[in-house]
Amino acid sequence: MQDLEFSTYHQPVLAPAVLEALQPKAGGLYLDATVGGGGHTALLLRREPTCRVLAIDQDPMALAAAQEFLAPFGDRVQFWHGNFADLPVAEPMFDGILADLGVSSAQLDRPERGFSFRFDAPLDMRMNPANPLTAATVINHYSEQELADIFYEYGEERFARRIARQIVARRPLNRTQELAQLVAHCLKASPRQRIHPATRVFQALRIYVNQELAVLDQFLARSPHWLKPTGRIAVISFHSLEDRRVKQAWRANPLLEVVTRKPIVADAVEVSLNPRSRSAKLRIAVRTSA
């Protein structure tokens, strides 16, 4: 089945640290708020044979792959399709919560999803295909000022205005590599650059299309209320916009005691085996007894 590509691609980042963070216990109930390929959920279920996991994802292809990958665990894992900020939970019920933020390797490696400039594909970038807004709509219909604001706010792109001006002059742009080449030309980038010059623009578009930061803010506000007293929450972020939000929200929340003064990062061995882990940052907090 093609959707199993999600499972084969999903090497769970910071696996030992996640297990140490959540400390799965006998009979515990855990929330994997971004199940993706199912790697982290499988870790929890294998570590503690009597714990259970509610696994959710807004990407129906990822969820279908996770359901098949995790089928051997039977009814110890339940699935819910939707955004983690919209989970209908009204009371403390989880012993631990995990959120692995951002786009997965499987999503990046599927050309038709339009997340990556490594492939020539339609500018899509929707994590949930039911979302009516695509990256192409943003690129081709938003004003120069709106585009510049998106690139600066969500990509921290210092040449946002220059790039937006060129996009408006050259559009329509409907393909990933069209946009990537325009940005590279606009910035007069050297082919020897380690990071592609369009990286920040693509990040900004993906975050905007999926409203990732607004959704994360909702999750950070609601999720502490879903934890039982002494329950643990772990969030893996992949860029400073996410990490900053996690740090500030937890510090300001009286329901949480922050465990990690500084985020946990991957060591050189993990980075060599799983390059996606290079930018991963793990923060941990514990629900107080209040």
Curated annotation (Swiss-Prot):
InterPro entries cross-referenced by the UniProt entry: RsmH (IPR002903), SAM-dep_MeTrfase_MraW_recog (IPR023397), SAM-dependent_MTases_sf (IPR029063)
Record NCBIfam families: 16S rRNA (cytosine(1402)-N(4))-methyltransferase RsmH (TIGR00006)
Catalysed transformations (reactions): cytidine(1402) in 16S rRNA + S-adenosyl-L-methionine = N(4)-methylcytidine(1402) in 16S rRNA + S-adenosyl-L-homocysteine + H(+)
HAMAP family linked to this entry: 16SrRNA_methyltr_H (MF_01007)
Name used for this protein in its record: Ribosomal RNA small subunit methyltransferase H
Native organism: Thermosynechococcus vestitus (strain NIES-2133 / IAM M-273 / BP-1)
Lineage, uppermost ranks: Bacteria, Bacillati, Cyanobacteriota, Cyanophyceae, Acaryochloridales
Subcellular location: Cytoplasm
Record key words, sorted: Cytoplasm, Methyltransferase, rRNA processing, S-adenosyl-L-methionine, Transferase
GO biological process entries: rRNA base methylation
